């Protein structure tokens, strides 16, 4: 059965919770794909051989999506987190906007074809931070207010706006308040289909640049009816597993009417210099308890981010079944 529009599902079916896939980048790495590249998880798509039917890498990507779907995911993401035009044009042979558009179209069609018409597809857009690797500090230099966020996002955003295979645009892991305010200032001509913003929040429940969730909610409420009508959900991603339920609860208290999404990482800590993950923390709770708290606090899309695997998604799916 073909999916109903995502906006209709979120707005008119308040009891329905969607299961998102896990962290695609780190899961590909687990499966032996080399993502140690300035374009990170988009690296496999940049080689011509990926597009040949016999490609081994292509098989690995398909197997990953297949395993997430078997685990219960009914909304999946394109592997385009670090496929912004700047990173791609500076680091690959794709140099023009026309070639870039063909590149994104190929990734999206490949993903849609593989997941089918029944499931939802998110067009993943990583933050400006992804280009300079500071998702977990939010340190955008001395003048974050002067960065041309629109110029940075525009080529990828325009592509996802017009691509009918994309149901929902996801701005992921946003760590800086200036960037967040920029995205929230764009009207329906600039973001013309449903979108969400995933905030990158630390263990003290602050945006990585130190902004409180209260300041963020005051800003959102202050936009009143000027807010882009396509903003469908707010949420957090790549926050640590142990803190995620508390962070979501706070967000829900500040923005009670807003549908939320949450997809924490495994709780390990990323070292950007070594590009490795460290110190697996002991999980305070299991997925079942955590997912119940998510559902009780307004979560409508639940999944995993970096270092979560199909096994995590299966546990999330069975908890969602039980509690939603
Ligand atoms: C650094 S957060 C990365 C999110 C992205 N969707 C991925 O897992 O590939
Ligand atoms: Zn992540």
UniProtKB/Swiss-Prot annotation:
InterPro entries per record? Betaine-hCys_S-MeTrfase_BHMT, HCY_dom, HCY_dom_sf
Q: Which residues hold Zn(2+)?
A: 238, 305-306
Whether Chloroplast counts among this entry's keywords is: no
EC id: 2.1.1.10
Q: Where, per UniProt, does this protein localize?
A: Cytoplasm
Q: Which spans are transmembrane here? A: none
Matches recorded under Gene3D superfamilies: Homocysteine-binding-like domain
User: Catalysed reaction per UniProt?
Assistant: S-methyl-L-methionine + L-homocysteine = 2 L-methionine + H(+)
Q: Where is the Hcy-binding domain?
A: 6-320
Query: Per the record's keyword annotation, is Protein biosynthesis included, yes or no?
Result: no
Describe the task this protein carries out: Homocysteine S-methyltransferase involved in the conversion of S-adenosylmethionine (AdoMet) to methionine to control the methionine/AdoMet ratio. Also converts S-methylmethionine (SMM) to methionine.
**Stated name of the protein:** Homocysteine S-methyltransferase 1
Species per Swiss-Prot/TrEMBL record: Saccharomyces cerevisiae (strain ATCC 204508 / S288c) (Baker's yeast)
Q: What is the lineage of its organism?
A: Eukaryota, Fungi, Dikarya, Ascomycota, Saccharomycotina
Give the encoding gene's name.
Answer: MHT1
């Amino acid at each position: 059965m073909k999916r109903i529009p995502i906006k209709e599902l979120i707005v008119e079916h308040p009891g329905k919770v969607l299961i998102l896939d896990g962290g695609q980048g780190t899961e590909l790495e687990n499966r032996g794909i080399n993502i140690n590249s300035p374009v990170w998880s988009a690296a496999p798509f940049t080689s011509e051989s990926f597009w040949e039917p016999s490609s081994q890498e292509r098989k690995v990507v398909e197997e990953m999506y297949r395993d997430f779907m078997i685990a219960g995911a009914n909304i999946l993401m394109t592997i385009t987190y670090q496929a912004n035009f700047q990173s791609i044009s500076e680091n690959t042979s794709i140099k023009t906007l026309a070639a870039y558009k063909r590149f994104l179209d190929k990734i999206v069609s490949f993903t849609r074809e593989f997941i089918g018409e029944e499931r939802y597809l998110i067009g993943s857009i990583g933050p400006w931070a992804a280009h300079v690797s500071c998702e977990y500090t939010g340190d955008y230099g001395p003048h974050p207010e002067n960065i041309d966020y629109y110029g940075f996002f525009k080529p990828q955003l325009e592509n996802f706006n017009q691509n009918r295979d994309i149901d929902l645009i996801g701005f992921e892991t946003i760590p800086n308040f200036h960037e967040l305010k920029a995205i929230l200032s764009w009207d329906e001509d600039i973001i013309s289909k449903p979108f969400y913003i995933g905030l990158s929040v630390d263990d003290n429940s602050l945006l990585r640049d130190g902004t409180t969730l209260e300041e963020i909610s005051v800003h959102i409420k202050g936009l009143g009816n000027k807010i882009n009508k396509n903003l469908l959900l707010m949420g957090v991603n790549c926050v640590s597993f142990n803190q995620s339920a508390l962070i979501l609860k706070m967000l829900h208290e500040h923005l009670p009417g807003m549908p939320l999404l949450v997809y924490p990482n495994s709780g390990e800590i990323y070292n950007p210099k070594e590009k490795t993950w460290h110190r697996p923390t002991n999980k305070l709770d299991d997925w079942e308890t955590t997912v119940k708290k998510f559902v009780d606090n307004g979560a409508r899309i639940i999944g995993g981010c970096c270092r979560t695997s199909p096994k995590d998604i299966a546990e999330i799916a069975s908890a969602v079944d039980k509690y939603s």
